Amino acid sequence: YVDSTQGWRPTDASTAAAITETNIFISATVSGACNTLTTCGDYKIATFTGPGTFCVSAAGGPVAVADYLVLAGGGGGGPDHGGAGGAGGFRESYCATTSGSYTASPLATPTSLPVSITAYPITTGSGGTGGSATPDCGARGNSSIFSSITSTGGGGIKSPNISMTGGSGASGVGQGGPGVGGAGNTPPVSPPQGNNGGNSQATANYAGGGGGGAGGVGGVGGAPQRTGGAGGAGTTTSINGTPTVRASGGSGGGSSPGTSTPATPGGGGRGGAGATQSGNGTDNTGGG
């Protein structure tokens, strides 16, 4: 590469003709409210926080691939001393020859996604609504989609005693007896998109487990007594140029005299206890 005026020139032939026949990198635009296309060094980062389109206008060169982070909406937790929602599915790719040098999450696959000249519709999954009072339930998070990559919404609470599966599973519920956390990485993909929700202990503890996170299972509810389990750990990636923790599970709800359980870094909401309300997950993080 010479400069912005002369562009790319061959070095293995006795000619100084500029290369014009082949697009070396892909060119693309984004559409949709609040969606952005920014520059980070020699690379472009397309960020979607709402529905839109990733429109590729040139992809004929040797680098017709893109790396991605597809993050689904977290699940909603249950009411009272209920279980917590699981984090939304977390799926990432990273290949240095595609996207340069940055630190990806431990969950990243080394296989970038091939792209062609077309418009790719983007689906951004919203978080599930939490239950406000028994028998209200926490809704499953919504899935996010880019091309062939689907991240599944986090598990919610199906009934006072049943936890849903999802990208990361919802936790066991602390009402009516011990509860088993929902399964994460459902449907299964490799690398896994999430982890199981935490279990809850016997009825006398009245505390839900923590929702599963991208980086770990949810904590057990009722240990210590009447205190909700911690949300499962999120995971860190620098795909946007800044190390950021995303996709932690929500913390489970407890009951008096237990204490509220703090939010786990990565967007998951805190767990309430007694007069302390539970907290919502943070927008655009995939937290439960």
Regions found by a protein language model. Name each.
Residues 1-288:
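Glycine-biased low-complexity/repetitive sequence motifs
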